[in-house]
A protein has these predicted regions:
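Conserved amphipathic alpha-helical segments that form helical-bundle/coiled-coil interaction surfaces
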Residues: 95, 122-192, 207-210, 214, ...
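Short, flexible helix-adjacent loops and helix caps
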Residues: 40-44, 112-120, 141-145, 187-194, ...
């Protein structure tokens, strides 16, 4: 094996370089995870500036992994890069959220029949949803140490799991791109300057249980009511102005018309 000028074989130099990249990548992973957790916990609120020097001091690392971690969080849409200025925690507006929730509900309503048919054929759908619900319960079991990130992650998995049952990849891509569970969490954080409260989590668990029970029963109308109520209940937390109120009323009419189409006239979602 040909040696380098220092006497170290070139292959060994290559291995050392590979190891350095691995260590750096692992450190960026850890730093990104820590900053992400601080954002979910409300330590850094939407719109708040993220200063590399301050984060480096808090986390006890150099500037480079912090910069790399922030760029990763930009790609995840948790952080926003302001041209020629700095990086800030991304802000989520109420109207944007209500718009996204409306599109989400439209996707869920119009593919409810396909989801019910899949539940009839695939026993793993309900069991997968049960696993997500259990993980959500575990995330909030300790009042002094609620794992907000785990809650949002598992709630997202819950809804995406039954949408994959519609067997339409284009639909799934659109639905996943809405990212409403994360959007909802951070919109609340933006409004209240603190994470979701326990009563909201507990109500959410009840609503998710209703969705599972409807799928177990293979009852399409019941499933539609459960998903409609879940989305509309989320909307009400952001009913802060006339524009939001009008959009929410449109979403209600959409759900009620869909129930009418299932042969359940005069169904009101309230």
């Amino acid at each position: 094996m040909k040696a380098s000028k220092t006497g170290m074989p070139k292959r060994r130099n290559a291995r050392k370089s590979d190891l350095t990249r691995f260590i750096n990548t692992s450190l960026v992973d850890l730093v990104a995870k820590q900053i992400r957790s601080m954002i979910f916990a409300g330590d850094y609120l939407p719109g708040e500036k993220l200063v590399v020097r301050e984060l480096s001091e808090v986390l006890g690392v150099s500037h480079t992994p912090v910069k790399d971690a922030l760029n990763r969080l930009v790609a995840e849409e948790l952080v926003e890069a302001i041209p020629n200025k700095s990086m800030v925690v991304k802000s989520f507006t109420n109207n944007e959220l209500v718009e996204r929730l409306g599109v989400r509900l439209m996707c869920e309503l119009f593919y409810a029949g396909e989801i019910i048919r899949s539940a009839k054929e695939d026993d793993t759908l309900v069991s997968d949803l049960e696993a997500c619900l259990t993980a959500m319960e575990e995330a909030i079991c300790d009042d002094s140490n609620i794992d907000y990130e785990a809650w949002v992650s598992n709630e997202t998995r819950f809804h995406r799991r039954y949408m994959t049952a519609a067997k339409n990849q284009t639909l799934v891509s659109v639905y996943n791109g809405l990212n409403t569970n994360e959007f909802t969490f951070f919109a609340y954080l933006h409004n209240e300057h603190k994470p979701l409260k326990r009563p909201i989590f507990e109500n959410n668990l009840v609503e998710h249980r209703a969705i599972i029970d409807a799928l177990k029963a293979l009852d399409q109308a019941r499933f539609v009511r459960a998903i409609a109520w879940h989305v509309l209940h989320a909307c009400e937390d952001y009913n802060v102005d006339e524009e939001a109120q009008l959009r929410i009323e449109q979403i209600k009419r959409l759900a009620e018309c869909h129930l009418d189409g299932l042969g359940e006239p005069s169904q009101k979602i309230s």
